[in-house]
Curated annotation (Swiss-Prot):
Residues 360-597 form a coiled coil. The gene is FDM4. PANTHER family: FACTOR OF DNA METHYLATION 4, RIBONUCLEASE P SUBUNIT P38. It holds the Pfam family XS. This is Factor of DNA methylation 4. One of its GO terms (biological process) is gene silencing by siRNA-directed DNA methylation. InterPro entries: FDM1-5/IDN2, FDM1-5/IDN2_XH, XS_domain, XS_domain_sf, Znf-XS_domain. Residues 80-90, 144-167 have a biased composition (Basic and acidic residues). It comes from Arabidopsis thaliana. Residues 80-167 are annotated as: Disordered.
C-alpha cells in the first residue's frame, strides 16, 4: 500500500521516462500503444481509446495495485500534454502579428487567443506565465464566405487546460524557467511569432498546477485558512513563545459560524509559537463555503491578507485569509506546512475532478446494473427451467396417483370377488350338511318304521353309543386336566428356575411321573367303563390290575419326590433368609465405612443433587443458588415419595407385561421444560430405582453395589472386600 507522497513520486518518475523517450507511446501519426500493459503489448490504440484506457485505470477505485495506477495517471498526463494530434497551421490574414497593437507584447495579458486546428499558440489570461495551448478547430462561416471557401478564425476566451505548460502534481520537482534565454537558443518570442501568436513572453519563476492557466484562482486543497498575529506570551524559563491551543481557537471559530475541522498552531523549534495557525476546513464544498466566509469576515473587518501585508504595526488585531497559491509557495513555516498537507486546486479543477469521480461512479453503477440484469436473467431462466421440471414432476405424480388408485380399485374388486366366492362355498357346505341331516332323520324314521329285529341289538347299540360318548368325555376331561396341570407346572417351573437350578432334573422327573399317573388314571377309568359295557373280560381285568400296580408304584415315587422337594424348599428358604440377613448385616457394616471404594452401599432411589446445583447456578445469583438447589431437590423428593403420583405404565411386549416410564406425564414434561435434560434424567433414574426396589412404599432402599461395574454386588464380593480391607488395616506384629 503506497502513501500519497509515494504515488506522486512514482507518477512523476514514469512521466519523466516517457518524456525522455525511455518508454515509447507513439507508434505512428495515428497509432499509440500502452507501455505498461504487457498483456496487451501487441494491441494498438487510437489516441482517444488509449486516453480512455489510461484514465479508466488511473481514476478507478477498483485498481488495487498503486504502482499500476500511478503509471496510467502519468500516461494520461503525458498524452494530454504532448501527444494530442495536431496539423500544420494554415495561413490566415487575421493572424498577422504586425497588425496587433504593441501593448499586447508587454505586461500581463488580458485574453487568450485560439487559432484554427492547424496552429499551436502560447497564451495566458491574467498571468505573466505563458502557456502552450493546443487550439481546437473552430471555423466560422458567414453567409457568403463559407461558400467561397474562405475561412475565418474564431477566438476563444479560455485555453485548453490539458495542454497548459504548468503541472500541478510536482511543483517542487520541475525545473523553473529563467527570465533570459541561453546564448544561441532561439527566443521564445520568436517561436511564438513564427506560429502566428501575438505576445511578448515573460518567464515564470515556478510552474503552477493544472487549471491555473485558465484564469481561475488557485486555492490550497483541502481548503485551508491562515490566522496571523495571534497573541503569544514569552516564557522566561524556556526562552520561547507560547500561545493558545488549537482546540480553543477552533471553539472560538465555531462560535463565529466558520465550523473548521481542525486548527494547527505553527511552532518553531528555536522561538516556539510563531503567531500563525492553519485552519483546516476539509475537502468538501461545505468547507470551501466556510473558508470563503472566513476570508470575507476578515476582509470586511480590514484584517485580511492585504491589510496584514501593508500594515507595519498590526497591534493586537487578529488577521486571517484563505490559503492560496502565493501562501503555498512561500518560503516560511506556512508554506512548508501547506506543501506537506495539501496541494493547489482551482474551483473549476475541483469541479472537473468531482465530475470525473461522478462519471466513474456512474460507469461502475452501470456495470453493476448490467451484471445484476444478467444475473436476473439467469435466475429467470433457472426459475423457468425449475418450473417446467416441477410441472413435469407434478404430472408424473398425478399419473402415479391415478395408477395407484386404479390398482387399489382392482385389488378391492378382487377381494370382494374372493369373499363372494367364499360365501357361496359356505352356503353350498351348509346346504350339503342340511341335506345330510335330513337324510339321517329319514333313515331314523325308516328304522323306526321298520322296527329292529330284536330289542337286544337296539339296546346294545344305544349302550355302545353312550359308552363311547362317556369314554370320549372322560378322555377329553383327562386331557384338559393334563394340559391345565402342565401349564401350571410350566408356570411354577418358570418362577423357580432362577432360584433352584439344581432341582430342574428332579422336578422334570416328578412332572413326568405325575403326568403318567394322571394318564394311567384316565386309562383306568376308560377301561372301567369299557368293562361295564362288555361284561367280565379276563384280559381287560388283567390290564386293569397291572395298571393299578404301576399306578401305585408311580404314586409312591411321586410322594417320595414330593417330600424330598418340600424338604429342599424349606432348606432353600432357610438358606435364603440367612443370606438376606447376611446381606443386611454386610450393608450395615459397610455403611460405617467412609472411604470411597469400588464396593459399597448405594441408596437406591436417592436423588442426585448435582444437576439441581448446576441449574440453580445458571438461573439464580450465586448467593441464592445453593438455597434454590436445596428447595428444588426437596420438592422433587416429596414428589418421588408421593404414592398418589404414579408415572409408570404397564406395556405388554411379546405376551409379557412390563413396566415402563410414562414420558407423557405432565409433571415430567414440566420438569424437562423448566429445568432441562440433566435434572430430568436424575429424577427419572431415581423414580425407576424406587419402583424396582420398593414399588409399593417408594422409599429409598440401601443396596450392596459394585461402583466400578455399575451393578448390584454379590455377598461374596462384599465379604472379599471387607476381608481385604481388614488385612490392610490390621496392625503388623512388632519385631523383637
Amino acid at each position: 500500500m503506497y502513501s500519497r507522497r509515494e504515488l506522486e513520486d512514482l507518477e512523476y518518475r514514469y512521466y519523466s521516462e516517457m518524456k525522455d523517450g525511455t518508454r515509447k507511446v507513439k507508434i505512428s501519426e495515428s497509432l499509440f500503444r500502452c507501455p505498461f500493459c504487457y498483456i496487451d503489448r501487441k494491441r494498438d490504440y487510437q489516441f482517444d481509446d488509449l486516453l480512455r484506457h489510461a484514465s479508466g485505470i488511473g481514476g478507478s477505485s477498483r485498481t488495487k495495485d498503486g504502482r499500476d495506477k500511478a503509471r496510467h495517471l502519468a500516461l494520461e498526463r503525458y498524452m494530454r500534454k504532448y501527444l494530442r494530434p495536431r496539423e500544420r497551421p494554415r495561413p490566415s490574414p487575421t493572424s498577422d502579428v504586425s497588425s496587433l497593437p504593441k501593448e499586447e507584447f508587454t505586461g500581463k495579458w488580458k485574453s487568450t487567443l485560439s487559432t484554427t486546428e492547424e496552429g499551436e499558440f502560447i497564451t495566458t489570461e491574467n498571468s505573466s506565465s505563458p502557456h502552450i495551448v493546443k487550439a481546437e478547430p473552430k471555423f466560422v462561416s458567414g453567409d457568403d464566405s463559407g461558400r467561397s471557401g474562405e475561412e475565418r478564425l474564431k477566438f476563444s476566451d479560455k485555453p485548453d487546460p490539458f495542454f497548459s505548460n504548468e503541472d500541478k502534481s510536482y511543483p517542487a520537482k520541475r525545473p523553473c524557467l529563467v527570465s533570459g534565454a541561453k546564448e544561441g537558443d532561439e527566443p521564445v518570442q520568436r517561436i511564438g511569432l513564427s506560429h502566428g501568436a501575438s505576445f511578448a513572453p515573460t518567464y515564470p519563476q515556478k510552474l503552477v498546477s493544472l487549471g491555473a492557466g485558465n484564469g481561475d484562482q488557485m486555492y490550497v486543497h483541502p481548503w485551508k485558512g491562515i490566522l496571523a498575529n495571534m497573541k503569544r506570551t514569552f516564557n522566561e524559563k524556556t526562552r520561547k513563545y507560547a500561545g493558545e491551543s488549537g482546540s480553543k481557537i477552533r471553539e472560538d471559530l465555531i462560535k463565529k459560524g466558520f465550523n473548521p475541522h481542525k486548527v494547527t498552531p505553527l511552532w518553531n523549534g528555536r522561538l516556539g509559537f510563531t503567531g500563525f495557525a492553519i485552519v483546516d476546513f476539509g475537502k468538501e464544498w461545505e468547507g470551501f463555503r466556510n473558508a470563503t466566509m472566513f476570508d470575507k469576515h476578515f476582509e470586511v473587518s480590514q484584517c485580511g491578507k492585504r491589510d496584514h501585508d501593508l500594515t507595519r504595526d498590526p497591534g493586537d488585531k487578529l488577521y486571517g485569509w484563505v490559503a492560496k497559491q502565493d501562501d503555498y509557495y512561500s518560503r516560511t513555516a506556512i508554506g512548508d506546512h501547506l506543501r506537506k498537507q495539501g496541494d493547489l486546486k482551482s474551483v473549476s479543477g475541483k469541479e472537473a475532478e468531482d465530475q470525473r469521480k461522478t462519471f466513474t461512479l456512474v460507469s461502475n453503477l452501470e456495470n453493476t446494473l448490467v451484471t445484476k440484469s444478467d444475473n436476473l436473467q439467469q435466475m429467470e431462466s433457472i426459475y423457468k427451467q425449475t418450473s417446467s421440471v416441477l410441472e413435469k414432476r407434478m404430472k408424473e405424480k398425478d399419473e402415479m396417483i391415478n395408477t395407484h388408485n386404479e390398482k387399489m380399485s382392482i385389488m378391492q374388486q378382487t377381494a370382494r370377488d374372493y369373499l363372494a366366492s367364499i360365501y357361496e362355498e359356505h352356503e353350498k357346505a351348509s346346504q350339503h350338511l342340511e341335506a345330510q341331516r335330513k337324510e339321517y332323520e329319514d333313515r331314523e324314521n325308516y328304522l323306526d318304521k321298520c322296527q329292529a329285529k330284536n330289542k337286544t341289538e337296539r339296546r346294545k347299540l344305544q349302550w355302545q353309543k353312550h359308552k363311547n360318548l362317556m369314554a370320549t368325555q372322560e378322555q377329553n376331561k383327562a386331557d384338559e386336566d393334563m394340559m391345565r396341570l402342565a401349564e401350571q407346572q410350566q408356570r411354577e417351573k418358570d418362577e423357580l428356575r432362577k432360584q433352584v437350578r439344581e432341582l430342574e432334573e428332579k422336578i422334570d422327573a416328578e412332572q413326568a411321573l405325575e403326568l403318567e399317573i394322571e394318564r394311567m388314571r384316565g386309562d383306568l377309568q376308560v377301561m372301567g367303563h369299557m368293562q361295564e359295557g362288555e361284561g367280565e373280560d379276563s384280559k381287560i381285568k388283567e390290564m386293569i390290575e397291572k395298571t393299578k400296580e404301576e399306578l401305585k408304584e408311580k404314586e409312591e415315587d411321586w410322594e417320595y419326590q414330593e417330600s424330598l422337594y418340600q424338604t429342599l424348599v424349606v432348606k432353600h428358604g432357610y438358606t435364603n433368609d440367612e443370606l438376606q440377613d447376611a446381606r443386611k448385616a454386610l450393608i450395615r457394616s459397610m455403611r460405617e465405612l467412609t472411604t470411597r471404594a469400588y464396593i459399597g452401599v448405594k441408596r437406591m432411589g436417592a436423588l442426585d443433587e448435582t444437576p439441581f446445583k448446576k441449574v440453580a447456578k445458571e438461573k439464580y445469583p450465586a448467593v441464592e443458588a445453593d438455597k434454590k438447589a436445596e428447595e428444588l431437590c426437596s420438592l422433587w423428593e416429596e414428589h418421588l415419595g408421593d404414592s398418589a403420583w404414579h408415572p409408570i405404565k404397564v406395556v405388554e411386549k411379546d405376551g409379557i407385561a412390563k413396566e415402563e416410564l410414562n414420558e407423557e406425564d405432565e409433571k415430567l414434561q414440566e420438569l424437562r421444560k423448566e429445568l432441562g435434560e440433566e435434572v430430568y434424567a436424575a429424577v427419572t433414574q431415581a423414580l425407576k430405582e424406587r419402583n424396582e426396589y420398593n414399588g409399593s412404599g417408594r422409599y429409598i432402599v440401601p443396596e450392596l453395589w459394585n461402583f466400578k461395574q455399575n451393578r448390584k454386588a454379590s455377598i461374596k464380593e462384599g465379604v472379599v472386600y471387607l476381608v481385604n480391607s481388614w488385612k490392610q488395616k490390621k496392625p503388623k506384629p512388632k519385631r523383637r
